[in-house]
Design a protein with these regions (language model features):
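Thiol-/selenol-based redox modules, centered on thioredoxin-like
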Residues: 145-146, 151-186
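N-terminal "domain-start" segment that seeds a small globular fold
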Residues: 20-57, 77-79
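Short, internal strand/loop/helix patches
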Residues: 114-146
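Short acidic, S/G/P-rich loop/turn micro-motifs used as interaction or catalytic elements
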Residues: 69-74, 106-109, 165-166
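C-terminal motif of bacterial Sec signal peptides marking the signal peptidase cleavage site
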Residues: 15-18
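Structural microenvironment flanking redox-active thiols in thiol-disulfide oxidoreductases
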Residues: 76-119, 133-136
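Short active-site neighborhood of thiol/selenol oxidoreductases, capturing the structured segment around
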Residues: 53-77, 83
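Sec-dependent signal peptide recognition
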Residues: 2-10
């Protein structure tokens, strides 16, 4: 009897994790099914102040770090400094690799987000998507926030999904893909 219960429990765990794996694969395939679109009039912010950057959406590789309205934007902002090492490691690629930090906070949190961005020591532009345009243009974005960081090729097709800060393998793949696409840094 104990053996049968143990076997059923083990089978349940295998099915549970197997289904989760299948769901993640399906979400990644969905994300890769269409190119990512960017709104034409994105508001960039540096240190909480609006900045006009007209040439930002252009050819080249793009790493998108997207935070939707469900996530805690202030929590994400407080950890943005962690990206500094990856930015520094890729600075030699100059304009061939861009980083897109897209925050889509709830309306009632917009001022709090701007204040938090003003305080942090983060020199890179951040997009505050107050109207949720990014998500509307990309209905194929998965709900799973672990899949909200992705690398795009020059045509905005997703070529890597995952956060290089949270997964060493993703980090290695990120640098490998960047080097394959852009060559060795100058």
């Amino acid at each position: 009897m104990k053996t049968t219960l143990y076997f059923i429990y083990l089978l349940f765990l295998v099915l549970l994790f197997g289904c989760n794996d299948t769901k993640i694969k399906r979400e990644i395939q969905q994300l890769q099914s269409k190119a990512i679109s960017f709104p034409y009039n994105m508001n960039f912010t540096i240190h909480g102040r609006d900045t006009l950057i007209s040439e930002y959406v252009e050819n080249g590789l793009k790493l998108v770090i997207y935070t939707d309205s469900v996530e805690c934007s202030s929590c994400v902002i407080s950890k943005m400094y962690l990206w500094n090492s990856i930015i520094e490691n890729t600075e030699l690629y100059k304009d061939k690799l861009k980083f897109y930090y897209i925050l889509s906070p709830q309306r009632q949190h917009i001022e709090k987000v701007r204040s938090a961005l003003n305080v942090i020591d983060f020199e890179y532009p951040v997009i505050i998507d107050t109207l949720g345009k990014f998500a509307k243009l990309n209905p194929h974005l998965p709900e799973n926030k672990a899949l909200h960081t992705f690398l795009l090729d020059e045509n905005n097709n997703v070529i890597l999904v995952g956060n290089p800060l949270r997964n060493k393998k993703i980090e290695e793949m990120f640098y490998q893909i960047v080097e394959e696409k852009l060559g060795k840094p100058e």
